[in-house]
Curated annotation (Swiss-Prot):
UniProtKB keywords: Acetylation, Membrane, Mitochondrion, Mitochondrion inner membrane, Oxidoreductase, Transit peptide, Transmembrane, Transmembrane helix
Keyword Oxidoreductase in record: yes
Organism from which the protein derives: Homo sapiens
Keyword Amino-acid biosynthesis in record: no
Subunit details: Component of the cytochrome c oxidase (complex IV, CIV), a multisubunit enzyme composed of 14 subunits. The complex is composed of a catalytic core of 3 subunits MT-CO1, MT-CO2 and MT-CO3, encoded in the mitochondrial DNA, and 11 supernumerary subunits COX4I1 (or COX4I2), COX5A, COX5B, COX6A1 (or COX6A2), COX6B1 (or COX6B2), COX6C, COX7A2 (or COX7A1), COX7B, COX7C, COX8A and NDUFA4, which are encoded in the nuclear genome.
Record-given protein name: Cytochrome c oxidase subunit 7A2, mitochondrial
Gene: COX7A2
MF term (GO), any: oxidoreductase activity
Segment annotated as transit peptide: 1-23
Residue positions, PTM N6-acetyllysine: K33
Length: 83
């Protein structure tokens, strides 16, 4: 059993230490230029279509959740009639 645990430990270390190193291009300066431009476009639209859809979905869920909470508070404020 100890041998199995040691083998498992070695496999875990091997996969972490010998994983291929991927070099990603630093996109931060490009994004900074994009978002710092003064072109009268709202910030939440500068990210493209995905950001616009995410913003709209967030707004719809926020407004819908607020309306639902107010509705439930209104329903809870009126006691049910007992017959």
């Amino acid at each position: 059993m100890l041998r199995n645990l040691l083998a498992l430990r070695q496999i875990g270390q091997r996969t972490i230490s010998t994983a291929s190193r991927r070099h990603f291009k630093n996109k931060v300066p490009e994004k900074q230029k994009l978002f710092q431009e003064d072109d009268e476009i709202p910030l939440y639209l500068k990210g493209g279509v995905a950001d616009a859809l995410l913003y709209r979905a967030t707004m719809i869920l926020t407004v819908g959740g607020t309306a639902y909470a107010i509705y439930e508070l209104a329903v809870a404020s009126f006691p049910k009639k007992q017959e």
